[in-house]
């Protein structure tokens, strides 16, 4: 398969084809089985996090170093010229990309990654999250994890639970899975946190089946993947939050009627939406999912920075 990802900006999931997603998943699996310590030899990657991050930043930096590359950058914008001296984001990007072979950026402003790609002088920009907009590399590790546990990306029943309105991870993953065949979605959320209309309209246009379900228990027996998210307390008053939260807590008891192959995923951090008794079940896979972030990001970096592998 030709590597169409070479020197490509990775800004949003809709801009990646099914073939490109499959190439990343395949490459992640190969790297997990057989480490490749020289794929980024003599390469420098700028890791610029204008917003707090733990898993994404550390997994990117681990991925770069395990491939033999070097990292420059920062994990807070507070001490940069952007914050201290009023430098524009466009100017900052132009300077930093002149030092590096790729530019990984997280930023609180929606559209910041797209802006960076316009001022990077051809250096590939990888979006590590831009506000509530897109988080494409989380989607890549999610896809790899689904493939690793199910052996396929077609013909799957997938449920998303919790905050489907503001959760950028569920938007991106829905758009990615919509590129595959035989996918059926279950959207389980309170009405105030329902999946946005534009996502449902995209699925309608593609003829992809989805159901709006009030209870997890109604969907669990049919599922291959149960993707949990945190309901954000700050969006509700105390009484409303208590009611909503209690309806979307997963326990080991909920999983008793589940298929043997069902895996529970979560972008983390969890608060109390997954009971700790789920951790000991064979369905729990969220910690392995987080670990897979290193392999998915290794695969992406290797493909973006190498014409052939």
Swiss-Prot record:
SUPFAM superfamilies reported for this sequence: Aspartate/ornithine carbamoyltransferase
Top-level enzyme category: transferase
Annotated L-aspartate binding sites: 85, 168, 230
Binding site for carbamoyl phosphate: 55-56, 106, 135, 138, 268-269
Listed InterPro entries: Asp/Orn_carbamoyltranf_P-bd, Asp/Orn_carbamoylTrfase, Asp/Orn_carbamoylTrfase_sf, Asp_carbamoyltransf, Asp_carbamoyltransf_Asp/Orn-bd
Recorded superkingdom: Bacteria
UniProt keywords, alphabetically: Pyrimidine biosynthesis, Transferase
Alphabetical GO biological process terms: 'de novo' pyrimidine nucleobase biosynthetic process; 'de novo' UMP biosynthetic process; amino acid metabolic process
A Gene Ontology molecular function term of the record: aspartate carbamoyltransferase activity
PROSITE patterns, sorted: CARBAMOYLTRANSFERASE (PS00097)
Role, per record: Catalyzes the condensation of carbamoyl phosphate and aspartate to form carbamoyl aspartate and inorganic phosphate, the committed step in the de novo pyrimidine nucleotide biosynthesis pathway.
NCBIfam families: asp_carb_tr, PRK00856.1
Similarity section: Belongs to the aspartate/ornithine carbamoyltransferase superfamily. ATCase family.
Subunit structure: Heterododecamer (2C3:3R2) of six catalytic PyrB chains organized as two trimers (C3), and six regulatory PyrI chains organized as three dimers (R2).
Protein name: Aspartate carbamoyltransferase catalytic subunit
Organism listed in the record: Aliivibrio fischeri (strain MJ11) (Vibrio fischeri)
Origin organism lineage: Bacteria, Pseudomonadati, Pseudomonadota, Gammaproteobacteria, Vibrionales
